[in-house]
Design a protein with these regions (language model features):
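Phosphate-binding site of ATP-dependent enzymes
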Residues: 39-121, 145, 150-152
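Short small-residue beta-strand/loop micro-motif enriched in glycine and branched aliphatics
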Residues: 32, 107-109, 164-168
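A structural signal for short, well-ordered beta-strand elements
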Residues: 37-40, 175
Length: 196
C-alpha cells in the first residue's frame, strides 16, 4: 500500500523485481475495471493512475504465462461445495471488461479440460484460500496454471458475478444444482449462523 504517488525509482524497481509485462490493478474492484497489462516501464505510471480511480489500494503483479482457471466454492450448513473448474480463454490481451461482457471475446469452458491431478490441486487450493481468508457465501478463486502444471492463485473474487451468463452460475449448473438451490443454501446458512 502506497500513497498515490510513485517516482521513477519505483518504476525501475518494479521492472527489476517483476519484469515486464506486469498487471496493475485495483485491490477492490470488479469486472476488471482499472486493470492494465503494462508492457513498458513508461506505461506504469498511467496504469497506476487508472487503478487508483477504482480503489485506494493497488496491486502490481507479475504476468504469469499459462491457462486461466476459476473455481467456485461455498461452505454452507457444514458442507463444502467445490464447483467444477472453468477455463477462461480470452481472445483479447487478457480477460478484461470487454472480454467478459462482449459475445465472442472469450470462451468459458466448464468443466475445464485438465488433468485429474491439476483439478485436485486447484480444488485443494480453492478450499485452503476460502478458509484462510475466512470467506463466507459463494466465491470464485482464480488461478493461472503454467505449461508445467504449476498453479498460481491470482485472486479471490469474494463477490463473483451471479448473472445467468457468469462463471459461477455455469459451474453450479454443471454440478447439477439450480441457482435457486444455491441461493436457498446461502440464505439458510446465513440465517442459521446469525441465530447462533
Amino acid at each position: 500500500r502506497r500513497q498515490r504517488q510513485m517516482c521513477i525509482r519505483d518504476r525501475k524497481e518494479i521492472v527489476r523485481t517483476l519484469g515486464l509485462p506486469v498487471f496493475v490493478k485495483p485491490n477492490a474492484s470488479g469486472s476488471s475495471f482499472g486493470v492494465t497489462k503494462v508492457k513498458s516501464e513508461a506505461d506504469i505510471l498511467p496504469a497506476v493512475a487508472e487503478a487508483f480511480t477504482e480503489s485506494d489500494e493497488i496491486l502490481i503483479e507479475e504476468c504469469i504465462r499459462g491457462r486461466e482457471m476459476g473455481c467456485g466454492m461455498l461452505i454452507a450448513k457444514g458442507r463444502e461445495y467445490i464447483f467444477p473448474i472453468t477455463e477462461i480463454v480470452s481472445k483479447k490481451e487478457f480477460f478484461d471488461y470487454e472480454a467478459k461482457y462482449t459475445a465472442g471475446c472469450s470462451d468459458e469452458i466448464t468443466p475445464a479440460d485438465i488433468a485429474p491431478e491439476i483439478k485436485a490441486e486447484l480444488n485443494r487450493l480453492t478450499a485452503l484460500a476460502y478458509k484462510a481468508c475466512r470467506c463466507r457465501g459463494v466465491v470464485r478463486v482464480d488461478f493461472i496454471v503454467t505449461p508445467e502444471g504449476k498453479p498460481y492463485l491470482i485472486e479471490i473474487n469474494s463477490i463473483p458475478g451471479m448473472s445467468g451468463g457468469s462463471i459461477v452460475p455455469k459451474q453450479v449448473r454443471e454440478a447439477g444444482m439450480t441457482l435457486g438451490e444455491l441461493y436457498d443454501l446461502i440464505i439458510e446458512d446465513t440465517y442459521d449462523r446469525d441465530r447462533r
